């Protein structure tokens, strides 16, 4: 895909696929027979839909960073380099009615919103706080329960108990639906997460937890804030477990599809663990400080494993033409640009009015 000197991490600007890494990428697909069967069962349309999702996620972040640099907004929380952890799992779920699953993203999993069916303009409107956005200008976290997206909660780590409750409702109603959420490595220090996973294990809830270890919590490396291995957690709580490559969208897809099948079969919760890397700052305001937390070799290591570039190279190896990929990129770029323009128009025409501030705060009897 096109690289943007003003917005992309420097490691991405001259990105080319490393032959050895691509051999590992292909081998990863076939390393587990169950996951291999899931991937090999995907149609070309499904594979290209995943590609569109990765592009949409990356270009969403590019648009936000463009807004920051041009003064439209003051900062943005981006998921550059972590797109596979979001897009693969979301595409493994049911994203339409009947029986739409429910996801509860962190702010860095914004791709879950548009891949579950929210128009991308709605996500941009949320950042701008417009009155016609999903929250009516009351929250900068995007979500829409009609699309199966529970908005993030500002208190880090408070979402897992909520998604566990949603999964409990599926179980009690006999609905063939699954809940899913992501947990950052830093968020694992929150007590509510442990309560949620324990409850899900005891009640055999149809829910998937993904520990998204991007190596850093705000400005604290995982080696400083956590001891032991997250791989031990599933056994601790008596739930199914697994690990996938956080920069490999197909491995993420397959692991999540199997976990969803496990839940739908009445076998209960799954805790998946994945390693990836935050290529920028906690938000756009601290990128320089964030890059001082790790040495240049670490950024090069993860930069060479760009999840969008790796998947694009894999698709070409599977016979998808460069022209076809470029056409898809042009379509998605136009979609994202149009969504950003719609949101900017809303900022001019549909900002929330002060006399509506108390509306929607309490439910009426």
Where are these regions (language model features)?
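Short acidic/polar alpha-helix capping motifs at helix-coil junctions
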Residues: 26-31, 129-131, 196-198, 276-278
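Conserved acidic/glycine
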Residues: 1-85, 282, 288-365
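A generic structural signal for short, non-catalytic loop/turn and secondary-structure boundary residues
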Residues: 47-49, 96-98, 135, 265-267
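Cofactor-binding active-site loop characterized by glycine-rich and histidine/acidic residues
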Residues: 65-203, 221-231, 236-238
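Glycine-rich ThDP/TPP pyrophosphate-binding loop and its adjacent helix/strand module
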Residues: 149-348
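Short acidic, gly/pro-rich beta-turn/loop elements at beta-sheet edges
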Residues: 113-115, 219, 282, 353
């Amino acid at each position: 895909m096109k690289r943007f000197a003003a917005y992309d991490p420097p490691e991405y600007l001259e990105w080319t696929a490393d032959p050895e890494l691509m051999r590992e990428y292909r081998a990863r697909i076939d390393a587990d027979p169950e996951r291999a069967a899931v991937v090999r069962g995907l149609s070309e349309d499904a594979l290209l839909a995943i590609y569109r999702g990765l592009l949409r996620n990356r270009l969403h972040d590019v648009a936000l960073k463009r807004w920051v640099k041009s003064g439209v907004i003051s900062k943005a929380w981006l998921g550059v380099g972590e797109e596979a952890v979001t897009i693969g799992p979301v595409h493994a779920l049911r994203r339409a009615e009947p029986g739409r699953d429910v996801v509860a993203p962190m702010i860095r999993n914004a791709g879950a919103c548009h891949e579950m069916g929210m128009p991308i303009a709605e996500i941009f409107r949320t950042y701008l706080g417009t009155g016609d956005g999903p929250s009516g200008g009351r929250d900068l976290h995007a979500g829409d329960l009609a699309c199966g997206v529970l908005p993030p909660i500002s208190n880090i780590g408070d979402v897992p108990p909520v998604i566990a409750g949603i999964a409990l409702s599926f179980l009690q109603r006999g609905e063939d639906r699954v809940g899913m959420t992501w947990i950052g490595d830093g968020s694992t220090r929150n007590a509510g997460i442990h309560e949620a996973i324990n409850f899900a294990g005891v009640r055999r809830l149809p829910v998937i937890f993904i520990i998204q270890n991007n190596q850093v919590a705000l400005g604290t490396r995982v080696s400083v804030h956590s001891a032991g291995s997250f791989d031990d957690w599933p056994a601790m709580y008596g739930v199914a477990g697994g690990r996938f490559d956080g920069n490999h969208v197909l491995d993420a897809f397959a692991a999540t599809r199997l976990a969803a099948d496990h839940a739908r079969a009445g076998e209960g919760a799954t805790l998946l663990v994945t390693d990836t890397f935050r290529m920028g700052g906690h938000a756009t305001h601290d990128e320089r400080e964030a890059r001082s937390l790790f040495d240049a070799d670490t950024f090069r290591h993860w930069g060479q494993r760009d999840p969008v570039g790796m998947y694009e190279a894999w698709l070409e190896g599977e016979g998808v033409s460069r022209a076809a990929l470029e056409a898809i990129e042009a379509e998605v770029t136009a979609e994202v640009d149009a969504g950003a323009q719609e949101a900017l128009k809303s900022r001019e025409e549909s900002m929330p009015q002060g006399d509506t501030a108390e509306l929607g705060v309490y439910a009426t009897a």
